[in-house]
Structures are given as C-alpha cells and as structure tokens.
C-alpha cells in the first residue's frame, strides 16, 4: 500500500439512501490530524484500509526560551491539506457508490478563535505544545483562589463522597489545558476582545474548526471526548464546567454547543468542497479514537499508545474516575444511547526522544533500534529520563529536565539506545502502577498496543515483561486512530453494528511476559526512579 499522490478532485453522486446495515458499496473516509502528521484513509464496507494519503503538519515555533515557547499551526494550510488529502483517496471510490461517510479524529487541546460571521481566524492555531501560559498557570496554582477551590473540594468530598469533589481537591491548571493559553491570547489581541463584546467570537479545537469550515459556518459544535481534555469541561456533569469558567473569567459565550461523538449525522460537508455532500458521522479526540480502533470499548479494557507521546487508557464504563495523581477522567465517546468514560495517564516524550537520539547519530533509523538495544548488556548501569516536556502522570512536574545519568567512558551507543527505550517502558510502568493503586482493575487478560513506536519489538516486550501482562499489538498500528474514527462513522451510517466491532479489529504480534526479565527490570526501575528524583524541579 502506498501513499496516494493523486491531486484530481473526485466528482461523485453520493446517494443519501437509508441506514441499512452492510451496504456492499459504501465507504468511510477517516481523517486523523495528529501532532506531526495528517492522513486521510479510505475504508470499505468491511472496514479494511483500501488507500491512504498523508502529509506533515507544519508547526511554527517562536520564543527564545521554554517558558515563552510558542507553537502554532496555520489554519488555512491545515484546511487545504485536509481537503486535498480527502480528495486524494476519494478518487478510488466507485462512481456508483451508495454512500461515503466521514469520520474525523484530531489532536486535542490545539485551538483557534475566529469571527463567527466571516470564518476569518483571529490568529494561528495554538498547539497543545505551546508554552505561552506556563507562568500564568504557575501563578494561578499558587493563588488563594485555587487553594480555596481545593479546600472546598476536600470539605464537600468529605461530606458527600461524590467523585466530582474528590477531583476538585487536586485540581491544578496545566499548560496543555486551553484555559490560560486562550486568556493570554485574548489579552494580546484587541480584535478578539471586540468580537467577544459583539458576541461574534467563536472558539474551537481542531474538530470544531473543521466542521465550521466544512459547513461554511452553519454548524458550530464540539463533542465530549475532545471537550473533556480542555480543562473547561466537567465530565461528572457532562457539560462545560461553569465553576472553572467563572473562576478564571473565561468567556463562556465563545464555546461551541456539544453534540454526540457518533451514532447520528453530525454535519454534512458542503458539496462545493468535495464535489458532493458528505455526511460526517463521527468526530472525536485522537486517543479516544485509537482506543476504539484497538477494540477497547468494554469496562476494564486497556490500551497503550506509543506515538509522539505515550498514553495509557483504561475504559471505566458509565462513570468517570476521580484521581488524586493526575490520571484524567475523560469521555471516551458519546452516542445518542449512552456515554463511555476512560481514565488516561500520559508521558509527553516518546517518539520525540527517539527523533532526538537519531539526530545525535545514535542510530541511522528508528527501525534498527530494537536490534541495537538487544545487543547491549542487560545490566547496563545507565539511566535516561525522557522529560523534554517535563514529567506528567503521576509525577506532574513541568520543571523536570531530560538527562542521561550514569555515563561512563565505556558507555556505548547501544547502551544509550537500550536505556532510552527502557525509559519509555519505565514511564508506562510508573503510570500503570498508579492506575492499579487507584482503581480496581481486576484481572486484565491482555493490553492492546498501537502507535508508530509500537513497531519496536524490544519496547513492546519490555513493557510486557515489566507489567507482567501480555501485550497485543494491533495490525496497522500507525492507523489505529483513523480506524477508530472509521468504525464509529460506519456505525452512524449503519455499515456495521456494535456487536460486530471485535471482528473488524485485527490484531498482530502477541508479546508475553518473561519472568526473569520482570525481576531484572523491576530492580532497574527502582534505580531509575532514584535517577528521576535528581531531575525534578530542575528549571525552578
């Protein structure tokens, strides 16, 4: 299968039809907008990948230091890529097709504001990696206002035992939330303030922006899986969080309406864009899409994504999980019939550290790192802390530094590569340990694994041995998010039923834990945690 490079615009007559299951000549176009890559994938009526087209997402960086680092995306460039890539795969659709449905999944917490009347952007998209609000978040976290919120949460939880108040006890603002990045941007932009006063400013993450563009501004919506990661959505109330909005003086009137993730038509793309109207049957956050694409949809199912960052997700069913250690209670997806929640822990630096190591010349290609790591001694006395973006769950230290600890004159490149891969596994184990402390997980039969970095056999085997659980890698591991968006969009179109999803998800290699390796890795993990302590609060 190759990346399509056709640029011809497809002109088709997509019949609306009725939602009869298993239409043999129906397709789903799933678009996955990640941090570094945007890809459009064409799936057939059996949810098999028929073709795809992809491109790099261009990030614009500015700022002289980490504290003021700005990371942005040109919205016009992104929308042009979106349309072009979708058209690339549409040329492979039969002219007499019954229906084409679209599913969209996107990186979370990258946002933009625009004039609701003209769709004119007020600024570039502000990436989740952007640090412009880092100092503001720190000031707020030290403020009496937030301390009062934490104390109030503790008191109310003591008397009510409600999970919502338990979460409030530990609530902290982090830069990845959209709240303060938007407020900083609003303070810098007089045009935005005028639009707010006139009631014309629209705010949205990538999903909301795309739907507005596809419908020429007619539809202004978001959905809970994307909204729940922003920091201004209350998963316990299943609505925008009035308390937080009022505390930080966030202009609530700029927020989009909330709709479902899938199960019904969310919007219909204007026919002028793709040559015919296309129904959008699903939209959601990328990690939730990957969760569904891995076949993890029942309570207790576990998924690990290894991509730009590492994400560990546990499906919690009908109830959100209230955590004291930075495990996030998120909406997995919402349909007209029900809502499903997921608990998430993350580590920001996975492929990031591998790309950095490659740039230093530690290896020629990421594909060879598995064999290189295998060639290094098992008891290498070297430790790596993957903290270019700080240390997230469960440590939650934005000021941690990245470091090799234990370098010696006889340290080799192979040792360094092995240590880097082990550090990714150690972060997963750290998160997993906290999950086990806070949640009754019961017997977990298998963990599903996906993401580009999961192609690394050494890393998957290390995770399996360390967690002492089987790890099952899905087929087409780099496409799991697109697959999830396609599966949900196909449900909306009636192409398959929920009880058929398991048969549509294909799994690949199964990694089983090694008892000897488990003992050695546990010992090394203890030393690694000691090394980590030396890197915490480094930039304070």
Residue ranges and their predicted role:
Residues 73, 279-280, 471-472:
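Short, structured active-site "lid" loops
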Residues 2-58, 64, 100-142, 316-540:
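Glycine/Thr-rich phosphate-binding loops that ligate phosphate moieties of nucleotide
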Residues 74-82, 421:
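Phosphate/oxyanion-binding active-site loops and adjacent basic polyanion-contact surfaces
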Residues 67, 84-366, 529:
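Glycine-rich phosphate-binding/catalytic subdomain of phosphoryl-transfer
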Residues 65-68, 72, 76, 88:
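Conserved non-catalytic scaffold segment of RNase H-like nuclease domains
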Residues 29-31, 69, 304:
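Broad, structure-driven detector of short, well-ordered beta-strand segments within folded domains
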